[in-house]
Amino acid sequence: MGRTDSMPEAHGLNKLIRPLRYHEQSRQWFAILFVPLVSYFGQPRRELLIAGSVIAIIGALIRLWASGHVKKNKVLATDGPYAYVRHPLYVGNILILLGFSMASNLWWAYALMVFLILFYYPPAISYEDAKLNKIFGEEWQNWSKNIHALIPSFSGKAGSTSSEWSFKQSLFKNGEPVIVLYLIGFMYLLVTKL
C-alpha cells in the first residue's frame, strides 16, 4: 500500500505532484543531492563556513543519536531525542540542510532548502504521525500530546519506553555513520575553497 492510497483522488497538477511529495525515496534523494550540489557551487566565507559546519554537525549528531534509539514500527521510541521531539531525524535533516546552505554562502541554497522542507516535510510528518497512531494507538496519543513534531519540548513528559542507544543499530539499520562521513567529505570540499 502506497502512502497516498487512502487519500481522495487527486486531479490536475496535484495528481502529478502528490506522489512525489509522499515518496520517501524522493525526499531522501533530493536531500542527498543537495549536499554535493551546494558544496560544488559553494563560495564559502570563513565565518559562515564555521557557523554552517557547527549547525550541520549538530544535525548529523541528532540523526546519529535518534537512529540508535528508533526500532521502526516495533516499539514506539519515546526516549533519547524522542523525549524532546517526535521527529528528530527530520530535525537533524533540516539542520544539515541549513548548515550546508550557510556554509556554501549561496543565496539559492537557502531558497532550495526552504522549498525542500516545505514540499516534503509536512506530508511526511502527517503520514508518520498517522501511521504511528494506527500502530501504537493510545501509547502514541499520550506521548504525542506532550511532544511536538519538530520544535523541542522540555516538558519532561517523555513516553514509557526506555532503550539504550545502539551504534550497531545506527550503523546497520540506518547507515548513519556512513552518512556522517559523506557529510564530512562535502564539508571538506567547502573548506578547500577558502
Which role does the model predict for each range below?
Residues 1-79, 94-194:
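Membrane-anchoring alpha-helices and their flanking helix-loop junctions
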